[in-house]
Amino acid sequence: MISGCMRDTEVTKTDRLEERSPARWAIAVFAHNEEQDIVNALESVRNSASIAQVHAYVLINGCTDRTESVVENYAQRNEWVTPISIELGDKANAWNLFVYQVAGDYDAYFFADGDVEIEPHALNALYEELMGSPGANAAAAVPCSGRHRDQMTTYVTESRLILGNLYALRREFIQRVRKAGTRIPVGMIGDDGIITSLVKWDLDPTGEFKDERVAPCIHGKFKYRSLSPWSLSDLRTYWRRRVRYSLRHYQHELLVPILRQGGIRAMPKSTTDLYIAQKQCIAGLRPRHGLDSFFDRIALREIRASAGAR
């Protein structure tokens, strides 16, 4: 099994991976400083489908802890796992690399965060839901833990939103993504919002936005460790997460009008390009009400600094 080493958005000639493993499915596992959770995440992949059926590519991006060595040690004992080391710590960039330079041709593509534990048979359930929904481009999993699990489940089942923690994309959809050259802007926070939109648009932002293109899967479940209010480390994580949620909100608000007007080819390469293109709109952005307001102000300050629109 090959361990690939990637620098930001490029792969050297000697780093290119095999076109396809014998497995039918590929799963991208995004890992950024996940040394404590990544083994449990991979073990849960093992229990959620036959390891003869799925190949896991662990996208180790921008890690400053022991994640890389932990994954490499695990992969030495498990041929169905390939570590991919990426210098840039960015999920959107890692998503692009997986789709275009890592995974070959598979029957289905799964995406999971490196801190989630996938419930037994969840990948099978997602695949069956996807195959049983001919009009769907994606199948969305639901959480079975966390204080907000009921609310998040409602988002999936009623609003047909994709949660970035775990989802599946149809083979034909990935093929069309590649043919169109569609990439997520580097720096985009979270893949769930933009992937949900691309799936519902069927890669045509100027066309119809159809909920039925996302198939909710109530039997495809995952869980994750809840943050503790008594842990200083978890409080820091909570702070960063809330700022990132605010960034994600405004990034989506800025991106959608560009795509609706210019189509998929208008997709910016990075959030820096997005901010520059929407510099005039950024000046008019305002914080929301409630607790979000505090974190929105931090996010807006960062966005305006990147756009040079202080």
What are these regions (language model features)?
Residues 44, 57-69, 88, 116:
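A conserved acidic beta->alpha catalytic loop
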Residues 117-153:
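Conserved donor NDP-sugar-binding/catalytic core segment of glycosyltransferases
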Residues 229-310:
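Terminal low-complexity segments of carbohydrate-biosynthetic enzymes
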